[in-house]
Structures are given as C-alpha cells and as structure tokens.
Amino acid sequence: MSKSTPLKSSIIRADLPEQAEGRTGPETGKDPEKTGNSEGKTDTPVIEIKDLCHRYPHLEANALDRINLRIYRGERVAVLGANGAGKSTLFKHLNGILRPLSGEVLVKGEKITKKNVRMCRGTVGIVFQDPDDQVLAPSVEEDVAFGPINMGLSREEVKMRVKEALEMVGLNGFEERAPHHLSGGQKKLVAIAGILAMRPEVIVLDEPTAGLDPLSSARVLKLITKMNRELGITLLLSTHDVDVVPYFAERVFVLHHGKLEASGSPEEIFNDPALLRKAHLRLPRVAEVFEMLKQEGVDVNIQITAETARDEILRVIRSENRKAEMK
C-alpha cells in the first residue's frame, strides 16, 4: 500500500466492543492484533497478552484495563501514549516484574508463573526508562557482566559476551569507566549492553530516548534498529514522542488511560486525527508541515518521515513544472 494513500479506515479501533479478543472489527474483518506486518502470521506470538488488568493499591481505577495484544518474532513495535497512559506498567508485566490483577501474559506460548519467570526473563529483557535504576555496578564492564554471571556462564563466556555487547553499542574501551561519570546517553547504552549480553529474544525498551539530546537519541534509535536487523531481536519500545515512531516502528499500539485504543502501521495511526486528539497526541512535525500545506490549498499527501516527505515534495514540484510547460 502506498505511503501517500490515506489509511484511516484501516485502523483497528480497540475500544469497540466488536473487537474484543477473538472477534473481528466491523470495518476490516481483521483480528485486531494481526494488523501491519503481523497480518497473516500463523506462528506462535513471542509475547501474547490476554485481557490484562492491573491496579495499584492506592488507586481506584485500573492502571491497565483489558489489554489484548500479540508481538511476533522479529517485529519492531511501538507502544505510543502520553505520560500516564500505562506504558511502563504494561512493560513491567512482560517478564514478570509486575503480576496481573486479572488476565495473563504468555511468553512463547507459556503463561508467566512463579515457576517459569526466570526462563521468561531469559527470553524478554527490559531496559528501564532511567538507566540509574539499572546501571549500578562500579564499572561498565562489571555492570554488563552482571546478567551473564547470574546466568551461570563460564568466565570465558561472560568475558566474550561483555566484549561483543560493548562493541555492538559502540562503547568498547569504556570497560573500566565508572557509570556515574558517563553522560545520560552513554548510561543508556550501558543498560542496553547489559541486556544484550544476556542474549534475549525480545528486548523491551521503556522510553529509550527520554531525556536524551537529539544526537544521543538518534544514536540509540540507530542502535536498536541495527539490533533488530542484524541480530534478529524482537523490539518493543514505548514512547510519547510521536516523531520517533515513524523511524522505528513497523506496527503501533496506542495506549490511553490504561486502555488499548488502536493498532496499525504508523501511516494508519497518524492518518486518524480523532484518535490522536483522544490519546492526547499530535502529528509528527513532518506531517504537520504537510497538513499546513494542504490548508493553503497545495495538493499534497501527508507524509510522516523526512524520506517520504522529500519524495512527495519532488512529486509536487515535477507536477507543477509539467503544468507550467503545458501552458
């Protein structure tokens, strides 16, 4: 499907009663969790969430309310939502840090329980939003080695994994550095390296670009995309930054006040202004420029990345040149 084609009607709106687990949506007839690149997949999801609810003891309302979603091997998925939408709470269920009030989380078809939580954590690694919650050892090398050591690996294997992980994130030579002397972006890379060294099949990143300057943010996004493409790691990222999503995600889930509002490709999500308003989100900056051009009467299709924006601008210029030549 062309990126310039409006896709609003293809979005799966998860707040419709017809689209509860096991049913289909009224507009598309598709399973709501098999949109985008996962459509037509018959393999077992690497992560599956069924009717997940969670409530914190000090709150009356559910922090998560009947969440249903599936993540398939090799995907790059974004969970998009404003602050307080429930993204961090959702992610802490994915390897057993939090337990559901009701519903269940399955990893490779197995429900997370007290008995298998260690296995699940070997499959699903989590990078927390604040690296200071995760990077605690006196040196970078010790911090990255912590996970592999606790997996019972040999000293030689641990050393090899630490070396490979630091090379992957671009921090080779930082082994003896103290984490508290590093920048925020470097600490984030150390946290990612610590998870990489454990070689999980899935890495979950909670707001990985939060608090980073533009260059550090771009470096982290480039790294995690490389991890997906070169290592085949399934990636699940949460963010409130709408400008990040088009450059990372193949599929997007929109979370609002603990409820899954919609799922679809980035193009589909950002072609639904009503959904964005409801979820307290906005268009990516690139798309806002095209929206303003349309309001000025320019015949353009809204784009969401710099690359597709360039192509669309060139198309419009060539079209206008042809019209001028015909006069």
From Swiss-Prot:
Lineage of origin: Archaea, Methanobacteriati, Methanobacteriota, Stenosarchaea group, Methanomicrobia
Source organism of the structure: Methanosarcina mazei (strain ATCC BAA-159 / DSM 3647 / Goe1 / Go1 / JCM 11833 / OCM 88) (Methanosarcina frisia)
UniProt subcellular location: Cell membrane
Membrane topology note: Peripheral membrane protein
UniProt-recorded name of the protein: Putative ABC transporter ATP-binding protein MM_0887
UniProt key word Signal: no
SUPFAM superfamilies for the chain: P-loop containing nucleoside triphosphate hydrolases
Residues that hold ATP according to the record: G81, A82, N83, G84, A85, G86, K87, S88
EC number: 7.-.-.-
